[in-house]
Amino acid sequence: MSDAVNVRKAIEELRREINRHNTLYYVDARPEISDYEFDRLMERLIELEKAFPDFVTPDSPSHRVGGAITREFPSVRHREPMLSLSNTYSLAEVEDFYSRVKKLLLVEGVREQDMAAELKFDGVAISLLYRDGLLVQGATRGDGTEGDDITTNLKTLSSVPLRIPLTSLPVIEGIERDIEIRGEVFMQKDDFARLNEARPEEDRFANPRNATAGTLKLQDSGEVARRRLNFVAYYLRLSSQDSFLLTQYDRLELLGQLGFFTGKHYRLCRDMKEIGDFIGYWAVERWNLPYETDGVVLKLNDVALWPRIGATAKSPRWAIAYKYPAQQAKTVLQGVAFQVGRLGTVTPVAELEPVRLAGSTVSRSTLHNFDEIERLGLMLHDRVIIEKSGEVIPKVIRVVLDERPENAEPVGVPSVCPECGASLEKPENEVSYYCPDQDSCPAQIRGRLLHFASRNALDIQSLGESLVAQLVQKGLVRDAGDLYLLQQPQLEALERMGRKSAHNLLRALQESREKSYERLLYALGIRHVGQATARELARAYETVEALQNASEEELATVPDVGPVVAHSVKDYFSKSSTQMLLRKLRDAGFPLRFTGPQKLINRNFEGVNVLFTGALERYGRQQASELVQQRGGRVVGSVSRSTGVVVAGSEPGSKLDKARKLGVKVISEDEFNAML
């Protein structure tokens, strides 16, 4: 057997194995291997395909890594209209729908029929087209007749099979070359939280659905891949006739066999009582799911009857969506606090009489800005209705005016900063008030320090809120540069800071100097500059000097920047406080330049997130980190689903237990040494 044949077989086997593990992870939710082991399989496949490009196929899982830039999304016409479902918030209207369907069926001579009940995902509707089993097109719903072709972006979703196994389809005449799958793209709650944490405060998404819609419109498929979207399938079209697949339940089962995630929480309901039970059960249990669901979809189970019942111009008559009313509770506005963010924005926060809502106790709620207080007509001591819908944080939606107490009083708008006493400013055409004293306001200093130390910035884990508050209150730190001037005795004198804690912080600060230039740019906390923008700026301007000397016009041409961000960047570097901070960071050992990819000794840890816990005998923590980086890896400070391997030394901490719970591979120091 020739070498080429052996290589082809190895590549095909790798693809099968990777696709199998993708299905286990995204569809069945029972992974067999850690992320590290999966990444190694993918890296091996990419390596072989680069060496043997003739063996690359359109359905290779290596295409999921993204990277292609799409300048525009052409329109495509749907083969059948993507109708939206009529929806209701009323169980009585669901019962009316059920009765109406039964009457229509009686006219057709059909007495009893089951309804298929499925969870309604709060996402973005998508159509996938497979030709001879290969994914050839993915499109948004658009206006129902035409949508945007976003195939490149959808190929990055691991829950979208690039090829479906035709052998799993029923052996029935009439199946066409083109098979259509419809469903919903969504973002899990954890991934949504991670995405928002990496964005500037003023650019964060309100809820997972907004984040999903925004992500699918991105022109950079690499960024789409990094945001970890998911796809749930609920519709299958095999032919123009299609009635040989007799039930919707059968379709969902077949979709699962084809490798699609279907939500799994679907069932058949024989009568209105079972429908009501299903809706009632998930009204409570949906909060325990890892993704947002906002209702239940009911469909006549017998697909053959769908055309006989028909549809209106907008929606089918054989289906309805019951949407859960937003969770609401009545409580009392006890006060309004004013928070000052790291950029000086003053945000009013409602202080509420504690009340249970959506499975948790709520005592505070954002009021967004002072215009919102005026719009609501809100007064202190009012009874208010708070609501939790798709938003992460509950919001006040209205005042119960007929229950307004006699002691109600207006909410005063502060004229000075609640933290530093500076006179507040309200820029023209903006709704928020700002504290202009960026250099001295304690709240802004604390906010900037916490951002500088956050996980996606320099990841200084030992630097938490209480410690930052002490450092600022005692005048030890006024900007991030002062952190690197701290001494062990100063730290030991602080509350709850013994010798070991002080040592750990100094070590974490030392290690933070090794973080990349782009992460440092993000850590600076420039308004409107999130992780992606910081990455583009670092690539365009390889030194801080070059970046601060660039004109606004030049900055605006950088991908992901534009005029608003360019002005913000230029304004930031024009301040004397910024220049002082940069001098301190340079003196602390930060190179303040893009060093490019480190020269690798080998690629044994390429693309792997490595975490160390416990004490190592052969190496100090910094030396061990450098060994990983010299082999293409990245050292992280916390355990997550993206951690590839944990190196456990003597006396490991709680991170080891968490790693084992998540199924992350754990190795000893000897095994680590052997991998070098």
From Swiss-Prot:
Does the keyword field hold Repressor?
no
Q: Name one GO biological process term.
A: DNA replication
The reaction(s) annotated as catalysed by this protein in its Swiss-Prot or TrEMBL entry are: NAD(+) + (deoxyribonucleotide)n-3'-hydroxyl + 5'-phospho-(deoxyribonucleotide)m = (deoxyribonucleotide)n+m + AMP + beta-nicotinamide D-nucleotide
Give the EC number(s) under which this enzyme is classified: 6.5.1.2
Q: Which keywords does UniProt give here?
A: DNA damage, DNA repair, DNA replication, Ligase, Magnesium, Manganese, Metal-binding, NAD, Zinc
**Per the record's keyword annotation, is DNA repair included, yes or no?**
yes
Q: Where is the BRCT domain?
A: 600-676
Please name the SUPFAM superfamilies in this protein's record.
BRCT domain, DNA ligase/mRNA capping enzyme, catalytic domain, Nucleic acid-binding proteins, RuvA domain 2-like
Q: What class of enzyme is it?
A: ligase
Question: What InterPro entries has UniProt attached to this entry?
Answer: BRCT_dom, BRCT_dom_sf, DisA/LigA_HHH, DNA_ligase, DNA_ligase_AS, DNAligase_adenylation, DNAligase_N, Hlx-hairpin-Hlx_DNA-bd_motif
* Gene Ontology cellular component list: cytosol
GO MF:
DNA binding; DNA ligase (NAD+) activity; metal ion binding
Active-site residues from the entry? K120
Cofactors that this protein relies on:
Mg(2+); Mn(2+)
**Binding-site positions, NAD(+):** D35, Y36, E37, F38, D39, S84, L85, E118, R141, E184, K299, K323
Residue sites binding Zn(2+) per the record: C417, C420, C435, C441
UniProt similarity note? Belongs to the NAD-dependent DNA ligase family. LigA subfamily.
Q: What does this protein do?
A: DNA ligase that catalyzes the formation of phosphodiester linkages between 5'-phosphoryl and 3'-hydroxyl groups in double-stranded DNA using NAD as a coenzyme and as the energy source for the reaction. It is essential for DNA replication and repair of damaged DNA.
Name this protein carries in UniProt: DNA ligase
Source species: Chlorobium phaeobacteroides (strain DSM 266 / SMG 266 / 2430)
Please name the gene that encodes this protein: ligA
